[in-house]
């Protein structure tokens, strides 16, 4: 399926502007035109932060920004889907054009700026799937013009508490001015304190404890990673997602669009994000869940993330270039890898290559 998409489907979609093509793909999922049969393998199931995932492969936030097609994404084979980023009030994001394909690099640069329809629209959609099976997480953010950005994250926790299976606190988008400053130790302490307090208050009212993950940037120094790891441990955070898009343009082949402002995702992000993942694993130890994101476009790259220290992995840009058959292809490859490695579960392969990845040098 992914091979057919690369020769025919992608060619057709790429005749459209990137944002139009994205809209068409959402429509295709809504109408049921896009379907894929995917394998189920008990050896791929993994328990993370109290949740049992049927497999470790998830759809990253940014694709289904407004919670329109989470169940359709699960039907493609994803073990979980993350909607958002959602802000309390609707916002249009940055001016177009704001998504740029780098085809030779199998990459994308975006400067969308948290464009979304806001909490209310997503709440109505997610309410319609209440009670359905499948793990759907909610990625929460802050409005660009918010006077108290942390209050926006707290509002997201409270609004979606009964509907989200987990939350991701996104403070690492490079496209909202000043947002990444929340990764600094003092700001992060206040953010996590208030967010986790809201989570605990909501949980006490309904006896459900929703995990909260923190999504970080790949452009952090070792000292910044130290601070985040220490704060995550002190606050008893449920997990860390490594990583968001990068500001680095290292190693790009495609001169066209490479100088555009925004975050780079796709194949060129794989090395950097995997090194940062492994370094974070060394800092947080074996018990804290880590979710690896960045450059996953095959079973090999998904497995590399797991061996570098990821409990779960997510992709997005790989789907743009490989098509809706990619999740099934990755899951089949992971099942084969489990047999080849002589283990009974994908979880047994975690951390096999952490030291080697953490020791790699990053090029700015």
UniProtKB/Swiss-Prot annotation:
CDD domains: DHOD_2_like. InterPro entries: Aldolase_TIM, DHO_dehydrogenase, Dihydroorotate_DH_2, Dihydroorotate_DH_cat, Dihydroorotate_DH_CS. The active site is at residue 173. It catalyses: (S)-dihydroorotate + a quinone = orotate + a quinol. It is a peripheral membrane protein. Its cofactor is FMN. Catalyzes the conversion of dihydroorotate to orotate with quinone as electron acceptor. HAMAP family: DHO_dh_type2. Belongs to the dihydroorotate dehydrogenase family. Type 2 subfamily. This is Dihydroorotate dehydrogenase (quinone).
